[in-house]
Each structure stands twice: as structure tokens, then as C-alpha cells.
């Protein structure tokens, strides 16, 4: 242990030279203890989950860089919290190298947030992990990046091992599998490769689509797949594509995937995203930090593509709050997240920002038509005022998906009046090329303002 404490102390010393005292004290002050060295991994005790994730996301590459420059060897660092030690009792357990050497214990079924978009994938994954009889084989889960596929893979592995510590579970990313195969091939140790991957009970393969350009590896994986399948070993595969969309993957491999159960994971809906954010706040263990409902709604509304985007936004807020303040409001949150929010604010459904959008749209339109804002919003029936007024209604609907009722409240008009105004503009655009050019120009101005001010 003395050797590894020295290594970590040396790395910390170099980190303190690179970063400010504020950054160092905030992140590394309480990460001075090496917890243990096991399976060629140096375990460092982190203050909490938030600090641990922060180090992984921001500083791990620098830590590895410093390590290589001073010690001339590839050292593996893993950060662990007291909570994880207590829950898993990892200090008293000697797991098979196939298992906890490559499974992430923070992923489990308990902290996987279920919604309509992932419910079936969750249920089938759990069923596989609990059943001794293999009935679903292979299980193929696909969906966009950051929707929880990897979480489910690790959850399956962790649950199987918890139920039966003698089970040999191997989680591997497709790119790691390819690299391993190539290295063993070069060193003429292909039998070692086969022994490693065939001497298992469960194979969890992540991101199979990466194998698309690795023809030789595909052949070897096909042989492995058949060997495991025929010997009644469980196989679970994830991808960002459905089997029908996989390109440059051998047809006989695809047919093997399609012989099992194929499940997709879709994007989570708004309510589901809020639940995920609440879970992330709990995981980060930041008890004194307050993030109100409006701010969570901001994140959930704007970051809709994947969970990692939301987590990144939440981490950014935590960093700011931890450094400067224990509490922030919506306006401050919007400013902190500004670099991440470009082109996304139109998704935000908060009432105050809806008003802000409409106001800024009207500033651009009134300037273009050389009329006053109060005239644009007024009741004058002259075409000079009604045309830009209707354009504002139309663009509020088209660009920002406001409902007729929402637009009506702003203009003090009923649903029918807003609907008629929008339809008039649609008709004019179809019939009048010059008018269409004017509307397109206004849209361009609005989007330009969006990029510079992030309305």
C-alpha cells in the first residue's frame, strides 16, 4: 500500500501545480487516501458520488497523463465512496476476475428509473438476471446513446453475481473485444483469447455496431456466439441500431441476434426525465444544495436527447453552486447553462420564458414593419398592424410550438382569432413568393438573435 500511496501523493502534488487552489481544494482535498490495490487497480476514496463523477468526467485524463509521465506504466485508477464500500462490502469479498473487474457496481436495477420508454427492456433484463433457466437468448437491446442500455447490462451482471458468486460474468465493449482479439492475434495467443471468452456463463456485449468494419473479429465473435449459445450460456447485446439497420455486420450474425428477443429503448418523456434528475441528485449526495422545481423543469425540457446530457447540465450547476452559492434561481441557472442551451430553449415550457420569447419575436417584427410594439399588440384593424400581428402569432406557433390559447393570452385574443390569423399567414406564404421571403428573413433574424442571446 505504501507504494500506491506514494504514487497518488505524487499525482496530487502535480495536480495542485496545474489547477488553482480553489479547484484543487474543492475536488481533491479529501481524496488523499488510497483505499486498496486489487486486480491491478488503485482504488482511491472519494468524498462523495458527485466528486467521484466530477473526477471521472473532468480530471481522469489528466491523472492518467501525469501517471504515465512519472511512472512509465499504465496505472488504473478507480474512485470509490464510503457509501459504496458500506453497501457492497467490497473490502471483504474476493470476486472472480471475470466479474467485478469489469462490472460497474453503481449500476443496478434499484437506481434504474423506469418509464414507458424503457419498461419492457427493464423487465426482460431483470427476468434474465433472476431466472436460472435461460429462456431469452440472446437479448438484444437497442436505442440512442445515453438512454440506459449500459446501465441495464451492468445491472444484469451485478444481479447475477449477487445471486450466485460462482457465476462467471463478462462485460465487454465491442471496441475492447476487437482490440483484445487483434493483440492476441499479433502475439499468436489466440488460444488464450478463446479460453478467456469461452470460459464464462454470461456475456454482456456493449455497442455491437462498432464491429461493423472489423470483419476478422466478426468471424471470431460468430464462433464465440455459437459456442456460448450451444452451451446454454446467456448472451445480452446492446447497440444504437436495430438489427435491420446494422451495416457491414455478417448476415449470419444478424440472424443469430434476431433469433432472440429484440427490444428498443426510446427517449424518456418529460415526467420520466424529471424522475431521472431527482435520482441523479440523490446519487450525487449533495444534501445542502437546493435546486428548485423550475430549474429541474428547465433541464428536463431542454435536454431531451439522452440522459447523459441532463447529467452534464446537472453537474455544471452543482459545480457552480458548490463554488459560489448554496442556492440559485432560474435566471442564474439559465446563465450557468447558457453554453449548453443553444438552440434548446424553445423546448422550455416555463411561463415567464414563454412571455420572453413572444416579446423578443415582437421586437424583431415591429422593427421590420416599422411600427411600435403597442401598435403590434393593439386592436387597430388596419393591414399595417394586422399583418405583422398575424405573423407574430404564426411564428410563435411554428417556431416555438405555443398553443393557440397561450398565444391568445398574450395578444388578448380568443382561440378562434389566433387560428384564423395563423391560417391567413400560411395561405399568403403559399401564394405570394415575396411575402414568403419576408417571413423567411424574419425567421432568420429570430434564429440569429437566438444564437447570440439564447432567447
UniProtKB/Swiss-Prot annotation:
Q: Give the region (Domain II) as residue ranges.
A: 73-101
Please verify whether the record's keywords include Nucleotide-binding. Answer: yes
Per the record, which residues fall in region Domain I, interacts with DnaA modulators?
1-73
Q: Which UniProt keywords apply?
A: ATP-binding, Cytoplasm, DNA replication, DNA-binding, Lipid-binding, Nucleotide-binding
Q: Which GO terms describe its biological process?
A: DNA replication initiation; regulation of DNA replication
- GO MF: ATP binding; ATP hydrolysis activity; DNA replication origin binding; lipid binding
Question: Which stretches does the entry tag as region Domain III, AAA+ region?
Answer: 102-321
Q: Which amino acids does the record list as binding ATP?
A: 146, 148-150
Q: Where is the segment annotated Domain IV, binds dsDNA?
A: 322-455
Which HAMAP family does its entry note? DnaA_bact
Assembly? Oligomerizes as a right-handed, spiral filament on DNA at oriC.
Family according to the record: Belongs to the DnaA family.
Which NCBIfam families does this one have?
Answer: DnaA
Fill in the domain comment: Domain I is involved in oligomerization and binding regulators, domain II is flexibile and of varying length in different bacteria, domain III forms the AAA+ region, while domain IV binds dsDNA.
- Its recorded name reads Chromosomal replication initiator protein DnaA
Organism encoding this protein: Phytoplasma mali (strain AT)
Provide the gene name from the record: dnaA
Amino acid at each position: 500500500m505504501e507504494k500506491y500511496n506514494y504514487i497518488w501523493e505524487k499525482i496530487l502534488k502535480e495536480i495542485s501545480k496545474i489547477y488553482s487552489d480553489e479547484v484543487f481544494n474543492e475536488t481533491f482535498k479529501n481524496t488523499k487516501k488510497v483505499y486498496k490495490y486489487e486486480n491491478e487497480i488503485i482504488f482511491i476514496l472519494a468524498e462523495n458520488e458527485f466528486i467521484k463523477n466530477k473526477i471521472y468526467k473532468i480530471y481522469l485524463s489528466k491523472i492518467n497523463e501525469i501517471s504515465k509521465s512519472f511512472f512509465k506504466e499504465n496505472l488504473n485508477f478507480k474512485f470509490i465512496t464510503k457509501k459504496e464500500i458500506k453497501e457492497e462490502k467490497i473490502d471483504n469479498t474476493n470476486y472472480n476476475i471475470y466479474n467485478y473487474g469489469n462490472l460497474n457496481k453503481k449500476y443496478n436495477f434499484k437506481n434504474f428509473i423506469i418509464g414507458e420508454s424503457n419498461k419492457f427492456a427493464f423487465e426482460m433484463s431483470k427476468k434474465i438476471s433472476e431466472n436460472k433457466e435461460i429462456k431469452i437468448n440472446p437479448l438484444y437491446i437497442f436505442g440512442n446513446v445515453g438512454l440506459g442500455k449500459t446501465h441495464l447490462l451492468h445491472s444484469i451482471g451485478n444481479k447475477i453475481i449477487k445471486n450466485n458468486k460462482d457465476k462467471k460474468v463478462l462485460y465487454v465493449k465491442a471496441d475492447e473485444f476487437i482490440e483484445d482479439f487483434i493483440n492476441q492475434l499479433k502475439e499468436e495467443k489466440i488460444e488464450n483469447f478463446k479460453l478467456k471468452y469461452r470460459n464464462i456463463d454470461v456475456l454482456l456485449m456493449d455497442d455491437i455496431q462498432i464491429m461493423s468494419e472489423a470483419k476478422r473479429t466478426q468471424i471470431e465473435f460468430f464462433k464465440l456466439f455459437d459456442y456460448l449459445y450451444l452451451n446454454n450460456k446467456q448472451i445480452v447485446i446492446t447497440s444504437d441500431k436495430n438489427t435491420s439497420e446494422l451495416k457491414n455486420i455478417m448476415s449470419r450474425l444478424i440472424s443469430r441476434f434476431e433469433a432472440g428477443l429484440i427490444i428498443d429503448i426510446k427517449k424518456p418523456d418529460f415526467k420520466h426525465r424529471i424522475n431521472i434528475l431527482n435520482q441523479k441528485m440523490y446519487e450525487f449526495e449533495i444534501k445542502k444544495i437546493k435546486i428548485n422545481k423550475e430549474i429541474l423543469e428547465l433541464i428536463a425540457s431542454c435536454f431531451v436527447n439522452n440522459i447523459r446530457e441532463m447529467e452534464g447540465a446537472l453537474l455544471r450547476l452543482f459545480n457552480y453552486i458548490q463554488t459560489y452559492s448554496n442556492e440559485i434561481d432560474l435566471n442564474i441557472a439559465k446563465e450557468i447553462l447558457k453554453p449548453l442551451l443553444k438552440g434548446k430553449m424553445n423546448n422550455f415550457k416555463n411561463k415567464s420564458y414563454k412571455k420572453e420569447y413572444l416579446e423578443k419575436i415582437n421586437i424583431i417584427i415591429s422593427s421590420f414593419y416599422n411600427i411600435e410594439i403597442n401598435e403590434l399588440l393593439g386592436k387597430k384593424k388596419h393591414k399595417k398592424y394586422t399583418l405583422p400581428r398575424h405573423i407574430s402569432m404564426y411564428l410563435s406557433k411554428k417556431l416555438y410550438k405555443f398553443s393557440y390559447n397561450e398565444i391568445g393570452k398574450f395578444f388578448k385574443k380568443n382561440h378562434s382569432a389566433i387560428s384564423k390569423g395563423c391560417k391567413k399567414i400560411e395561405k399568403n406564404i403559399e401564394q405570394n413568393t415575396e411575402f414568403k421571403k419576408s417571413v423567411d428573413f424574419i425567421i432568420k433574424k429570430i434564429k440569429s438573435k437566438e444564437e447570440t442571446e439564447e432567447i
